């Protein structure tokens, strides 16, 4: 659970309500001083897009429901501007999947090129893994697959990896299975 807080008179924080992950969406970032919103956390959209990509890889088609979900992601995050690489990786991951499902080749190619250009400078391992796993799942590139496994596979040996690492491990395994690379 998280508390949504309000700052009163620059001296006191008061809880407004309590929310669970996935029950809220990032609306805007605080650009003055410390970032109030430090992560993008909407499990319904992230998991929904991932499942939609699975259905797309299985059938080659996109359902009406999956199209609606992809459009919702574009409405919610398409014009959001992030100031940190971590936030950019999260937003771009959502958007690339949405463009793939919608068949928007122009925007997909533009964002793919942007993400590829970010790879050398993104140092945070989980952000780098998110980029690579997303790129692999949306392009079926052997290079992105190899790079994603290089980052993610060592996490499999951790005694209790964080939830975000477990999610990336599962997604990578799903893409290997959906793209028929799990036999290798």
Where are the model-predicted features located?
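Helix-turn-helix repeat elements of alpha-solenoid scaffolds
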Residues: 20-30, 59-75, 105-113, 144-147
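"A position-specific structural signal for the A-helix of alpha-solenoid helical repeats
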Residues: 7, 11, 47-54, 94, ...
């Amino acid at each position: 659970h998280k508390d949504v807080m309000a700052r009163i008179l620059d001296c006191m924080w008061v809880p407004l309500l309590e929310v669970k992950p996935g029950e809220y969406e990032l609306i805007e970032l605080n650009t003055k001083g410390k970032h109030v919103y430090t992560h993008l956390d909407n499990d319904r959209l992230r998991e929904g897009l991932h499942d939609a990509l699975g259905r797309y890889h299985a059938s080659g088609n996109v359902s009406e429901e999956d199209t609606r979900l992809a459009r919702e992601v574009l409405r919610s995050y398409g014009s959001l501007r992030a100031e940190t690489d971590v936030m950019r990786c999260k937003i771009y991951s959502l958007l690339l999947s949405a463009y793939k499902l919608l068949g928007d080749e122009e925007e997909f190619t533009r964002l793919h090129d942007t993400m590829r250009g970010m790879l050398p400078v993104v140092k945070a391992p989980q952000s780098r893994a998110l980029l690579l796993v997303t790129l692999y799942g949306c392009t079926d590139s052997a290079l992105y697959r190899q790079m994603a496994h290089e980052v993610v596979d060592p996490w499999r040996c951790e005694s209790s990896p964080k939830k975000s690492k477990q999610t990336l491990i599962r997604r990578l395994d799903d893409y290997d299975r959906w793209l028929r690379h799990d036999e290798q």
